[in-house]
């Protein structure tokens, strides 16, 4: 099998443009997060989750209109598994689960089947928010320690900068578009951290090898060479991952749209940051 030719793209020479692009994205993301925040789902805000079954396919718009007319503001309705099963997310209600189920049946018709009713209290939602934030913090600290031991402090700070870059921009896009942020999206963010780190470490490994094998050469040339040598691997890994994620997004159903979207955004941003952000931080330090 014929080996692929190593490209000679001047990534390092274009790092100024990349830094400006990243700074703009981060600034917009932070501004959006500070002004309008994330649109948290009931996993974090508290509320009621109701799974409803129908004997035949149901029109979601009619269900939404029915709930809206009954003063259930902010009700989220989506298919769950098939077009005759729906999932309803409601804001916290001042009535019991039994009374709420009775009210929903009265609104939607006697032929519906209430499969389950789950209540998430505001306190539980607050605990999940705190735990989610701590999970990301612990992940970043663990990565900082791991990379510092495996490489050196410059590599460690470079990897953390790239990961924070990926997380902030992904959260910023969710804030800008006001896409619901629930536990599945949090799981996707943590997965993005792992994916981006793996990509970055592959690049760092090659940079370290090149520094050890090539003496008295401009660091920019060494890093540029490493980025070009790992480029085919980076592109092939990202493209195959994106193909799977696109299939999940378009064919996986509405229930996992946010999860798949977070991964799509994270993989694209993570691939970009492993090439430009992480390596730029090494040169800066």
Protein language model annotation of sequence segments:
Residues 1-285:
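A structural signal for conserved, well-ordered secondary-structure elements
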């Amino acid at each position: 099998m014929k080996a692929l030719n190593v490209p000679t793209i001047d990534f390092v020479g274009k790092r100024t443009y990349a830094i400006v692009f990243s700074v703009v994205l981060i600034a917009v993301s932070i501004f959006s997060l500070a002004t309008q925040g994330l649109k948290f789902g009931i996993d974090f805000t508290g509320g009621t989750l109701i799974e409803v079954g129908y004997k035949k396919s149901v029109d979601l718009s009619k269900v939404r209109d029915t709930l809206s007319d009954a003063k259930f503001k902010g009700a989220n309705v989506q298919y769950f598994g098939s077009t005759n099963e729906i999932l309803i997310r409601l804001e916290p209600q001042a009535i019991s689960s039994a009374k709420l189920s009775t009210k929903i049946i009265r609104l939607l018709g006697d032929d519906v089947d209430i499969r389950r009713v789950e209540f998430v209290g505001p306190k539980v939602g607050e605990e999940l928010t705190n735990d989610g934030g701590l999970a990301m913090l612990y992940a970043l600290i663990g990565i900082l320690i791991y990379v510092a031991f495996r490489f050196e402090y410059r590599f460690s700070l470079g990897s953390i900068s790239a990961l924070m870059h990926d997380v902030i921009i992904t959260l910023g896009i969710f804030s800008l578009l006001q896409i619901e942020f629930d536990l599945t999206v949090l799981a996707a963010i943590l997965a993005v951290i792992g994916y981006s780190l793996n990509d970055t470490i592959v690049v760092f490994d090659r940079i370290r090898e090149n520094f050890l094998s090539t003496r008295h050469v401009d660091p920019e040339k060494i890093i540029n060479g490493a980025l070009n040598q790992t480029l085919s691997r980076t592109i092939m890994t990202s493209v195959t991952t994106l193909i799977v994620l696109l299939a999940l997004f378009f064919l996986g159903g509405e229930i996992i749209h946010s999860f798949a979207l977070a991964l799509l955004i994270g993989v694209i941003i993570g691939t970009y940051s492993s090439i430009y952000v992480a390596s730029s931080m090494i040169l800066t330090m």
